[in-house]
From Swiss-Prot:
The keyword Signal is annotated on this UniProt entry: yes
Coiled-coil region(s): none
Protein name as annotated: Eggshell protein
First and last residues of every Sequence repeat: 25-41, 42-59, 60-75, 76-91, 92-112
Stretch forming the signal peptide: 1-18
Keywords from the named record: Repeat, Signal
UniProt region (5 X approximate tandem repeats), positions on chain: 25-112
Biased composition (Gly residues): 149-166
Region (Disordered), start-end ranges: 149-177
Keyword Plastid found: no
Length: 177
């Protein structure tokens, strides 16, 4: 019995190690991620670095303080304080990311929608809050509401023009949409 438990334990450790390795938490909590695919959980540049490449998606990619540049910066890409530049800066990327500190430039800097974070602060809220540029082209149907209104209240400057609204895109962890 003891041998069986030991074997199960070792297999579990091996699986956990393989899973973590395969998901490549590159950059961790402070580094940068550069390449065609930086996708992985808390990796991608973590909480302080920048993410540059074709796909910087996955979890908190782009981090809470860095910039996100590339084709797809995924969930939380762009972070809470950095810039988001590229074709798709994903959920919250360019939202709070383009909002409380940085800018959002690209084809889609709109915010996503997450049940845990029901207020969909997209590029509209972000750029409005900082008083420069118009809101992102897609605010997931909430652009007009949060663009100018929240911008004037929080940014000090002139609120950005609200986005025209867009299609609802649910949040998902592990990559951009």
């Amino acid at each position: 019995m003891k041998q069986s438990l030991t074997l199960v334990f070792l297999v579990a450790i091996g699986y956990a190690t393989a899973y973590t390795t395969s998901h490549d938490y590159s950059g961790g909590y402070g580094g940068g991620c550069y390449g065609s695919d930086c996708d992985s959980g808390y990796g991608d540049s973590g909480y302080g670095g920048g993410c540059t490449g074709g796909d910087c998606g996955g979890g908190y990619g782009g981090g809470y303080g860095g910039g996100c540049s590339g084709g797809d910066c995924g969930n939380y890409g762009g972070g809470y304080g950095g810039d988001c530049n590229g074709g798709d800066c994903g959920n919250y990327g360019g939202g709070y990311g383009g909002g409380n500190g940085g800018g959002c430039s690209g084809g889609n800097c709109g915010g996503g929608f997450d049940e845990a974070f029901p207020a969909p602060y997209g590029g509209d809220y972000g750029n409005g809050g900082n008083g420069f540029g118009k809101g992102g082209s897609k605010g997931n149907n909430y652009g007009k509401g949060y663009g100018g209104g929240s911008g004037k209240g929080k940014g000090g400057g002139k609120g950005g023009k609200g986005g025209k609204g867009g299609t609802y895109k649910p949040s998902h962890y592990g990559g951009g949409y």
